[in-house]
Amino acid sequence: MLSRRDWLLSAGAGFGGLALNALHAADNPLAAKKPHFAAKAKRVIFVFLEGGPSHLDTFDPKPALNKHAGKPIPDSFGSVILPMGESRSPLLASKRKWAKYGRSGLPVSDWLPHIAAHADDLAVIRSCVADGINHSAGVCQMNSGSILGGRPSLGAWVSYGLGTVNANLPAFVVMQDNQSSVVNGPRNWSAGFMPAVYQGTRIQGGAEPIPNLNTPEAVADAQQRGKLDLLTRFNRDFAAKHPAQTELDARLLSYELAFRMQAEAPEAVDLTKETEATKALYGMDAKETATMGRLCLLARRMVERGTRFVQIYHGAGSKWDAHSGIEKNHTELCKAMDKPVAGLLADLKARGLLDDTLVIWGGEFGRTPMSEKGDGRDHNPYGFSMWMAGGGVKGGQVIGATDEFGLRAVDAKLHVHDLHATVLWLLGLGHMDLVYRYKGRPERPTLNEGDPYTKIAG
């Protein structure tokens, strides 16, 4: 007797697969596509620390900052535009203890001891630059390349450029660590002006990880399949008479994907099959790290099963935004995030997945060397740190530098456009070759700007 999962899969492959089968591979927007050139990475996991973590207290030590603490930044630095306007506030010392880790001797603060153990896998970019000085613009740009809304997110561009290797799971998945609203909300994982089939699919906690996926108990599987087939026939007839309305094909594929996900998605998000040792590796055995540990483990399971792009929001609702009390704020957040992310790196490596899985860590900007409200730091898009690991990246290296106080990038500046171009390059996609025509215009993911930093590769 067929299980429900097997029946759903077989139904999707037979007459019920009308929406998918009626579209040839060339017309199917989610069909797997070849990269433009040899790829080093096949998939991406982006750990997004919403609110802006302090680079000065994590990956970019500044002895001069402590030496001159309590004094204003020298006049030679000129005017600094900050959202709170406190550019003349005294410099705030970092209370962190630093050590060099791995064979590379990569400096990491005592806030991140577990990630530090993977120093030789990390390429720390200390010279990131963005344009948004507030959260809405900064988060929007780090996701879409623009401080203005309405453009496709990086995950949507990857889905468009590479398609999916598993028709039963979303190509692009988004998760967050709490119930607070992420700044900008779904706009961050939107497909913008591209068909909605490329947008991110939310996965959440609780009994229903994927909202609205489960069929109501009163509706039988065969009944649901029949309704979908009938709707598909009507829509295909309409599409034949209105061939210019290509959005309909994308809608049909969305319906079909939702049906097929009912078979495979529940297994993909079922963590009961993971060993206790694996759960402990991710920190799921401790209250402080359980939530983020679960998300990181889910990310591994999704990419393992073919999802192209997974984004995890940590500190959703701008929790990393430490305008005051940075010691308490970052101590708690780093503890909640450090072990789970380190566990993800270790697990990917043990399974042979890290070599072609690109892991990205960072927020929309960093924090200022100047104090705010006495014991906090303001937003700093002028020079901050992110890191990448796996996916062809050469670990154990530091890229770029900020000035003596960590205010501005001064060497090997990498704008958000350069960062996005680098991610696409590692995936085998040329940022100028990846084009979507919208209203007659050739649109590109980096707005025709930026260059990949190819030296990041080993």
Which positions does each model-derived feature cover?
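Ligand-binding pockets and gating/stacking loops
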Residues: 1-458
